[in-house]
Amino acid sequence: MTVETFNPKQTTTLETPAKTLEAASADSTATGNRIGFVSLGCPKNLVDSERILTQLRIDGYEVTNSYDNADLVIVNTCGFIDAAVEESLDAVREALEENGKVIVTGCLGAKENQIREVHPDVLEITGPHSYEAVLKHVHKYVPKPEHNPFTSLIPQTGVKLTPKHYAYLKISEGCDNRCTFCIIPALRGDLDSRPAGSVLDEAKRLVESGVQEILVVSQDTSAYGKDKGGRTDFWNGMPVKQDITSLARQLGKMGAWVRLHYIYPYPWVDDLIPLMAEGLILPYLDIPMQHASPRILKMMKRPGRVDRQLEAIQRWREICPDLVIRSTFIVGFPGETEEDFEMLLDFLREARLDRVGCFKYSEVEGAVANTIAELISEDVKEDRYHRFMEVQAEISAERLARFVGRTMDILIDDVDEEGAIGRSFADAPEIDGMVFINGETELEPGMLVRAVITHSDEHDLWAELVDADAEDDIEA
């Protein structure tokens, strides 16, 4: 079976410009004016793209996967790190060269001058989650077509750019933290949580449409509701507390997998673990820890008590032994010494995290960290990155090996001529490993099957389907 290349640097980030164009076009039945669309960046940006595309479809526009026959192209950009900025500017350049009429939105759009310096011919620029402004600009350059809404019905979940069996659910915008390496608050503002009733309504529609996995995302998921001042919302006529634990509990009752991403290590994360142990939500935490040196964490303006982190991890695993922890770290942060880096390696060895991504520090325009201490050379960053990944590869292999011989639920993502490719509760789409079931070509994406794990490496699992009758006999 063909094994896709795993990128250990990748975190919860989705880069799918081609997929965006094709997926939106495939669902399009409108016959109005044509809009091209490119979506870059993280799942939060993907959700923004879905919302814009949904409104375009409602207004009667057709979304096309070709620049040539588009009346206008929208590029939803990312501006988090320099590589993302470069990719976004390249995408804008390509759209201008191939089409000529381009509207830019997204995180990089918050830096209009930076875009205009490189691409002065862009029609309009808006910042992130500026849905109404984007549509207003589209109407200006490509008037709304006359159309019969009954001939271009939109699914109740809106346009989705993910496979039909999973979807991202964004629960808030912005962030109140001020990590020195990050400029997201400057781009997307402070925390702004959606009303709980609105979130749960959307989740219910997703499940009713056939979604089997809900991936909860935001800039700071565990902070959900902090800005609500303890106010209660209502859903289905019942009061719902607006905090992440209460929201997760309600989501867990809907009958789909619920996976939490972007969890900041607040003390109340402890309250989520019993929900995982009960099976209400998946025993999976995406919790970026960034470093383990107290000195570096202080410079990052991140929680600095590593001993408490280790105690929390031990406590969580005692409550929920199946818990899978994914994290990301930065090596080569300004001022990082060899001693700081060794502390990070020691933390990895002690914490035994399941999935880990690593980034070499990259200067982000406007980030405080750029001038906080002496910058680390590229050679040193590269060396530390490889040493980091070498240590973690052994740990990840050990953690995955515990699943061998175990029967697990596998959600099928894809099927090719060699068999099926799926994921277990331990694997988020796009960023984690996969489960390969060789020879099972009759399965279909979206199926949830039982399989026994036969083999593992540092990234992936291999499995064989379990005969349902045989499993019933064993359980009896």
From Swiss-Prot:
Family the entry assigns: Belongs to the methylthiotransferase family. RimO subfamily.
Residues that coordinate or bind [4Fe-4S] cluster 2: 175, 179, 182
Gene (name only): rimO
GO BP term, example: tRNA modification
Domain spans labelled Radical SAM core: 161-398
Keywords, comma-separated and alphabetical: 4Fe-4S, Cytoplasm, Iron, Iron-sulfur, Metal-binding, S-adenosyl-L-methionine, Transferase
Positions of [4Fe-4S] cluster 1 binding: 42, 78, 107
EC number: 2.8.4.4
Gene Ontology CC annotations of this record: cytosol
SUPFAM superfamilies documented for this protein: Radical SAM enzymes
Keyword 4Fe-4S (UniProt): yes
Function in brief: Catalyzes the methylthiolation of an aspartic acid residue of ribosomal protein uS12.
CDD domains xref list: Radical_SAM
Database matches in InterPro entries: Elp3/MiaA/NifB-like_rSAM, Methylthiotransferase, Methylthiotransferase_CS, Methylthiotransferase_N, Methylthiotransferase_N_sf, NA-bd_OB-fold, Ribosomal_uS12_MeSTrfase_RimO, rSAM
Annotated TRAM domain residues: 401-467
Organism: Shewanella sp. (strain MR-4)
Cofactors (names): [4Fe-4S] cluster
Subcellular location: Cytoplasm
Catalysis: reaction(s): L-aspartate(89)-[ribosomal protein uS12]-hydrogen + (sulfur carrier)-SH + AH2 + 2 S-adenosyl-L-methionine = 3-methylsulfanyl-L-aspartate(89)-[ribosomal protein uS12]-hydrogen + (sulfur carrier)-H + 5'-deoxyadenosine + L-methionine + A + S-adenosyl-L-homocysteine + 2 H(+)
Top-level taxon: Bacteria
UniProt KW Transferase keyword: yes
GO function term, MF aspect, one: metal ion binding
Residues annotated as domain MTTase N-terminal: 33-143
Enzyme class: transferase
Protein's name according to its UniProt entry: Ribosomal protein uS12 methylthiotransferase RimO
Co-factor note (free text): Binds 2 [4Fe-4S] clusters. One cluster is coordinated with 3 cysteines and an exchangeable S-adenosyl-L-methionine.
